[in-house]
């Protein structure tokens, strides 16, 4: 069998069906992501003065960390100072 015949016969078959079921919508993906986070972490909502929020964002940018990671490090540091 020549290569051209192989190419025609191999690509002429039906495509495989999507095996994982229907893809999730963006809203469903977000909901599942939040549910996973809630299972492992606690949510903290705070209101900061704009200058402190800017400081936090600057720390995040300089260190390449998320706000959660920077706040966790700050809390750990303060807890060590207080011998907790």
Curated annotation (Swiss-Prot):
One GO BP on record is:
plasmid maintenance
Entry keywords, A to Z: DNA-binding, Plasmid, Plasmid copy control, Repressor, Transcription, Transcription regulation
Q: Please note every region of biased composition (Polar residues).
A: 1-13
Name the InterPro entries for this protein: RepA2
* Residue ranges, annotated region (Disordered): 1-31
Molecular function as annotated in GO:
DNA binding
Top-level taxon of origin: Bacteria
Pfam families reported for this sequence: RepB-RCR_reg
Q: What does this protein do?
A: This protein is involved in the determination of copy number in gene replication. It binds to the repA promoter thus inhibiting the synthesis of the mRNA for the initiator protein RepA.
What protein name applies here? Replication regulatory protein repA2
Q: What is the lineage of its organism?
A: Bacteria, Pseudomonadati, Pseudomonadota, Gammaproteobacteria, Enterobacterales
Q: Which gene encodes it?
A: repA2
